[in-house]
Amino acid sequence: MEIKEEYSIELEKKVQEKWEDEKTFKFLDDEKRPPYIIDTPPPYPTGRMHLGHGLNWTYMDIIARFKRMNGYDVLFPQGWDCHGLPTEVKVEELNNITKSDIDRHEFRRLCVELTDENVEKMRGQVRSLGISIDWDREYITMNPDYVRKSQTAFLKMYEKGLIYRGKHPVNWCPRCETAIAFAEVEYQGRTSKLNYIKFPYAENSGKYLEIATSRPELMAACVGIVVHPEDERYSDVVGKTVKVPLFDQEVNVYPDSDVEKEFGTGVVMVCTFGDKTDVTWVNRHKLEVKKAINEKGQLTEICGKYAGKKSDDARKEIISDLISENYMIKQEPLEQNVGSCWRCKTPIEIIVGDQWFVNVTKLLTEVENAANEISWVPEHMKARLMKWIEDMGWDWCISRQRLFATPIPVWYCKDCGEIIVAKPEDLPIDPTKESPYTCKCGNSNLVAETDVLDTWMDSSITPLVIAGWLEDEEFFKKHYPVQLRPQGHDIIRTWAFYTMVRSLAITGEKPWDEIVINGMVFGEDGFKMSKSRGNVVEPGEITKTYGADALRLWASNSTIGKDVPFAWKEVEYGGRFLRKIWNACKFAKMNISDETISELKSLNSISIENPVDLWILSKLNNLISKVSDDLGNYKINTVVEIQKFLWHEFCDNYIEMVKHRLYNKEESESAQQEKLMAQYTLYKVITESVKLLTPFTPHFAEIVGEIYEIDDLHTSWPVSDERLISLENEFVGEVVKNTVASIRRYKSNKGMPLNAELNKVEMYVSDEKDFNAVSKASEDVKKSLKIKELEINLGKPSLEQKISEVTPNKSKIGPEFKKDAGKVMAFIKEADADTIEKMLSEGIETEFGILNKEHIKEVKRAIYNKGEIVETADIDSLIDTIAIIQ
């Protein structure tokens, strides 16, 4: 098969079409091969992949391809995590509506329509990166069958008492107007004011307690005061009653060891609900529950004249009133970490209301045990999950006040308040559309649950769904737990944790054997990519110019678990590397016919004797061994070793050293055998190296694989031939490589063509081992460098540096010697080297007078060997080795 002149990234599209047409990556459930199932992260379908997706999918694909080539039956699906607020916001924006303007089911239809469009766009983007997905195994979380599984998982956990409905404080986003889980709260630094306020004693003694708070707008919901029982300043105030300024309710003072004595005044007001600690104190001291802030982030009617105002506006007015009524003692700057919604970054409130929860606290020990059974890559990432488990204070709030999500399959009896859950056989079901049940009290007039499930309730069952849960019981038993979960470190406390909770609750088993954690992508400026910083690079920008394989090489030159800075120069290097190797493959193919390839396939490499061939084959097999070990341990940046070997050892050196054998037209048996061995070695290095590159640059590998008739490119990983690994062979090869490279550099420095002939080269090698190595490969050295006569000597040469030419200083000699000037210049030109050296150092007495260095304009020196002028080249890395070139 002919090879094109230039490598073109346009070929990548044809390769992708071939894979899809031939279903190259289909999971076969082959009994003869062990399964390897990947719990692929389902991205949110925005319609555009970002570079973080490109990094993560490249990691996954490298692992999938490596496992497939090592004999595994790989199930690598693609999923889409469809539900969520961003789609609702986008639908409102595109249609110039709000979700309250139209019927909820029509609004959901618009969300589904937009999501379908975005999924189709992103399918193409995943394909464009050459990801070896089995598209027959695609799952979409908004599709009816997936909703059925998500609702079934809800029912199973409800039946086990692991899901409950209760009135409970929740993290609430006033911008999104929905509850959010503890794991969805992000903390941001903010400078605010710490307000020192007088709380007068109820007995009107004129005395007061001094309380420090950053949220005076919550004072209407103040239901108690707490002090540390060991704080001597307040030993006499426990049990007393104080009045809340501006709002006048009376509250008691309680002792509590959770109070930080050093913060503020050491006196804390307890509100329902300011933060998590308030929740703890309200429950511990059995205090009244008051609601000061509503779902829109506005103050409620208990706040009197401040009711209806946004929290920030109310705070300003209340502070102003506290000052004017002489309750404010002082204000100090306060640095805080404020909880914010992970999507819109709005500061959260804690409000109380009826919500659905997963009782995660019941499962924490099981999750911890499972985490210890799972292999973590890198290992230290497990600590993040363990820390999350340790800090877990609340159950997981799973109900959301939105529309585009999996419906909670529940109704409420209007008469007795009974909760009625759907039957498994009726799933999927939307209770706002259907009400097929009657309460046990006889009432059929049921109220539908309008809240929906948190989207993590969908994505946290992915390993179950991928392994065939609720589809094929035998398949599921055989394939669950799955082998691998790849994901980012930013969602360990959400996706990883929730998946473990759900899997353990439903099956009692861990979800996967291993979890591989990748980092995030940063811009060239060192900051996280964001539109506001202007440092975003999209995968399409890269692939359009450099191709998918260049992007994949950039991603591969990183360490799993660490954040990755993007750099255009690395992408450009990847493109140059592919062109370099393409040219090497093209050169080799010009010297290896299709008929010769068939012959080479049957040759045994052990019959090779040429030291240069043995050197590169030893290097190759060492490389195979290292790359195999590295990929087995998820060290994907081992691609650097492949690149160094191919570029520097193979292209820059080996090919140059075997050209003379490939070009040899001699018909002798020995010459033809040498040529065949060179062809075999070229073929072997190219085909084995292409296989090594397949997980990293699959398009390039596919194209070269077709040219070189590699039939098992996707199913066979190279095996290192230990017989060919030899330190001695590598030593000999390195000596030859350095000798050839040094003399080639000599030619280049002299402005000579690299293929210029050299009449004679004498090598003097001081080290006996080096001498034997060069001698062993003398023919390759001689013919690679086009040396007519090569002499290799053990020892050091008798070299002398002497003056070879001298130019008299006419401007000095003329005026000084006048009519004898010509004779003086002739004398200087004809003088021997010793005479000139003496003139230069101390001057000499002549018949014309004293001559010294001022009478010489220029001196040229040369190296002499055996009385002849020669040139020399030092041989890199060889001990006291020099080549004398004539």
From Swiss-Prot:
Reactions listed under catalytic activity: tRNA(Val) + L-valine + ATP = L-valyl-tRNA(Val) + AMP + diphosphate
Residues binding ATP: K531
InterPro entries: aa-tRNA-synth_I_CS, aa-tRNA-synth_Ia, Anticodon_Ia_Val, M/V/L/I-tRNA-synth_anticd-bd, Rossmann-like_a/b/a_fold, tRNAsynth_Ia_anticodon-bd, Val/Leu/Ile-tRNA-synth_edit, Valine-tRNA_ligase_type_2
Enzyme class: ligase
Chief location of this protein within or outside the cell: cytoplasm
Any Pfam family matching the protein: tRNA-synt_1
Domain text: ValRS has two distinct active sites: one for aminoacylation and one for editing. The misactivated threonine is translocated from the active site to the editing site.
Entry-linked NCBIfam families: PRK13208.1, valS
The protein's name: Valine--tRNA ligase
